[in-house]
Amino acid sequence: MSEVEKKVIDLVVDKLNVEASEVTREASFSNDLGADSLDTVELMMNFEKEFNMSIPDDQAQEIKTVGDAIDYIEKNLK
């Protein structure tokens, strides 16, 4: 498991109050983890802060699963 993956999982667990075992790469933020639209926006902001990066709104809308977030961050991390 990469450092990015660990941090993303920790942020999701903290924000959505779910068990780490529920946070898989395939888990959908809304369908599987119970996030509403505000939770999702706040998660993206938390990812931006944690990884010191910007996630444009059009890209954030495409990030629907934990794996999507990990892949996006790893690809765009400076």
UniProtKB/Swiss-Prot annotation:
GO terms for biological process: lipid A biosynthetic process. Pathway: Lipid metabolism; fatty acid biosynthesis. The modification O-(pantetheine 4'-phosphoryl)serine is found at residue 37. Pfam families: PP-binding. GO terms for molecular function: acyl binding; acyl carrier activity. It comes from the Bacteria. Gene3D superfamilies: ACP-like. InterPro entries: ACP (IPR003231), ACP-like_sf (IPR036736), PP-bd_ACP (IPR009081). 4'-phosphopantetheine is transferred from CoA to a specific serine of apo-ACP by AcpS. This modification is essential for activity because fatty acids are bound in thioester linkage to the sulfhydryl of the prosthetic group. Residues 1-77 form the Carrier domain. Keywords: Cytoplasm, Fatty acid biosynthesis, Fatty acid metabolism, Lipid biosynthesis, Lipid metabolism, Phosphopantetheine, Phosphoprotein. It is found in: Cytoplasm. One of its GO terms (cellular component) is cytosol. Its main location: cytoplasm. NCBIfam families: acyl_carrier, PRK00982.1-2, PRK00982.1-4, PRK00982.1-5. Carrier of the growing fatty acid chain in fatty acid biosynthesis. Belongs to the acyl carrier protein (ACP) family. This is Acyl carrier protein. It comes from Porphyromonas gingivalis (strain ATCC BAA-308 / W83).
